[in-house]
Amino acid sequence: MPEERTNTMLRHYPRALAFTAALVLLIGCRAQKVEMIRDTAVTDVSTLPEPAHVRRVAFRVPSESEIADSTVLASVRRGRALLRNTKDSLPRHVGNKLQCVSCHQADGTTRLAMPWVGVYARFPQYRSRAASTQLIEDRINDCFKRSMNGTPLVPESRDMRDIIAYMAFLSSGYPVGAEVDGQGLPRITPQQGDSTRGRTVFTTKCMVCHGTNGQGTDVAPPLWGRDSYNIGAGMARVRTAAAFIKGWMPQNAPGSLSDTEAFDVARYINSQPRPDFRGKERDWPKGGAPPDVAYRTRGRPSAARAK
């Protein structure tokens, strides 16, 4: 589920207490349903006080042995299975051949590979792309609509509840609002990237797994075409794709590409045809679209250079 998120996060203390209570129910109590928390009243964080500091904590993946309740454990495991096998498990909601773990490596438990560790503790969160405060359900559905080129889950559904159960499990013990060492992707110096050079990188480093035309194979997902992520996905941004590629590709030699090679091949991949995203022009309605967003938005009338 990749997208450069704003550093401004909602610190809404009643919701923070609700998160703590929900996590206690989820991890520590006897079998109980964790009620979905829906609060759409707050859509503008400009009137809320900024915290004095944002706490940063160490990366830690919890053990399933910490879950005392068998019903909760079953929910966590089912959520993880949905994220591993998204296309086959949720075919009505997935419009391509990707799984959530195509991008979120090792079930979202790896540092600097867009992990889900601690993510539940960072929601609700103000996101500039929507110019509103989003719940974690909203963020998950954003990925279904964009990265999976599909349709959103019903927020109160069992599927959504189990996915959130897994993410909440990975966030157990993290303070509300805490930043986690190792969240997101590796930092690399932004470059324009060259698609001609990128084609060479793709041919020599990527094609063996992803296919001659980026169509994907049994061992690697499609990178463009109708079975890949759409233009509204975070990975459709060259900077995001380059950071992911730099850190984790090729999988038999992660980190072996230079920053320039990563940007070149990201530029090449994202210059190829892919599905459109209806409503993309409504992204970043208050402005501030990142420079590598390759489509026009209301806040920015001219698109970034796509090739």
Question: What label would you give each PLM region?
Answer:
Residues M1-Y13:
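N-terminal secretory signal peptides that target proteins for export/translocation
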Residues L10-R80, T86, P124-T196, R296-R300, ...:
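Post-cleavage N-terminal segment of exported redox proteins
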Residues E35-A41, V54, L73-R78, L82, ...:
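Extracytoplasmic electron-transfer domains, predominantly the class I c-type cytochrome c fold
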Residues T71-D107, T189-T217, V238-T240:
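Sequence/structural segment immediately N-terminal to covalent heme-attachment motifs in c-type
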Residues D88-G95, T151-E156, V176-V180, A253-S256, ...:
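Surface-exposed patches in mature extracellular/periplasmic domains of secreted proteins
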Residues S89-P91, D107-A113, L170-P175, Q272-G279:
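Secretory-pathway/luminal and periplasmic proteins that interact with or process carbohydrate-rich
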Residues G184-P190, A220-G232:
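Short helix/strand-bridging catalytic loops that position acidic/His residues to coordinate divalent metals
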Residues D276-K307:
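A cross-kingdom marker for long, charged
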